[in-house]
Every structure is written in C-alpha cells, then in structure tokens.
Amino acid sequence: SYPVIKENSNNVELLIPKASFRINPGDMKNHAKTDRAINANNIFSVNRLSLEDSLESGRSLTLGLDYRNSNSENNNEMNIKLASVIRDDVEGPIPEKTTLNKKRSYIFGSVDYNKNDFINFEYNFASDNNLADIKYHDLGIGFSLNNFVTDFNFIEESDLIGSAHIIENTSTINFDDKNFLSFKARRNKEINLTEYYDLIYEYKNDCLIAGLKFKKTFYQDRDLEPSEDLFFYLTLIPLTTIEQGIDENLYK
C-alpha cells in the first residue's frame, strides 16, 4: 500500500490504496452454506473466512481504499474503508453469505467518527456493485457523559447476508473505578419481539471480577414462558471464570 499524505497545522489526512492477490490451485471443502461474515475490517485478513479445514479456493484480487483523518494530538477523528473482491471464476465452495464466491463481491465499507469524548459513531455496510442497493447496515452510536455510557446498535440484513432486523442497547453507570452497573437489551424488529434483557452489577480490581447478573429471556413460541435467571460469577485474572446459578426461590 502507498499512502498519500496531506498535512497541515490542525490535522493529518491519509489516503491508502490497498491490493492483495491470492491464488490456491487446490480444492477446498464445500462451505457454501457455512455462516461467515465479511466486512471492511477483515476482508484483507489472511484467513478472512475463518475456516480451519480449508484454504480459500481459486484466484482473487482484493482492492481497497482507506481514508484516515487525525488531529494534531494524533487521535483518529475519522476512518473510512472501502473494499471489494474480484475473481476470474465463480467458486462454489466459498460461503455464499460472504459473496466472495462470485466474480464480483459486494462492496464492503465502514465509517468511524470520533470527534470528541462525548459521542462516537460507527457504521458498517455492504452494498451491491453499483452502490445502489445496501444489503447490510450496522450502525452504532455511543454517548458518554461523566460516569454514564450508553451504546445503541442497529442491524439490518437482506438478500444473501440474512434477514435480521435488530436493535440493541448497552448502558453502564460507573459508580467509581471498581463498581459498575450495566443494562443490556436486544429487540428483534423482524418478529417484533424483545429477545432478552440483562441487568449486571460488577466489582473489578487488578486480581478479580465479581458480578451478579439477572437475565430475562423471551421466546417467540407461545408455549414457552419467558425465563428469568440470576447468576453469581467470579473471574480470577488471568486464571478462570466461575459461574453459579442462584435458586429462583430466593428472589421470587
């Protein structure tokens, strides 16, 4: 890669073109239906398909472009990535959801924006070759104010990638540098159902993490009632984690 640099007194801008050629004359196992995800952050990885028993078959050329804008303190305020894969022939054994099996894959992109400590923005997407139809959205927005941090995530999939439509939230209150209270929830808009919510208290120091977690899980099946579980867990750094469920009769 050959970066193009533009620098002034307030910021530094980098434009980095990327290219990677791969060839595998051998065969690979059939992973056409294997669930794998490609994005702008892993598309140049050596084992981007995360397969342990096969190498990606065929010949391919991965092309990409990175843009970075850093301020005078060398903090990245904005990162933009675009990448796509072209190949000379269709490769059936490659996971279909990735579209890397096609002669021209989807165009994968990401945008990260961190102007200040109060708000951050992250967007990942996958589009058809003409950038006319977005097949995948993953939008994350985070807010931080004093000891309160909350993150929202919106995921929408279509076509080969999937059919999910998810909204997630994680919120944390830091009482001090050792005591934390977190809330997590996930709603599936496709079936109009809240999948779960968690309420977690944690105590952390250099040697251990101790926590109490209440988890409520909902079900789409009308024959199954929502489940409520209370867990105590202890992590000894860096050795192991112990988790123990608490009898529901003690808290109901």
Question: What spans do the regions from the language model cover?
Answer:
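Outer-membrane beta-barrel translocator/pore domains, especially the C-terminal barrels
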Residues: 1-252
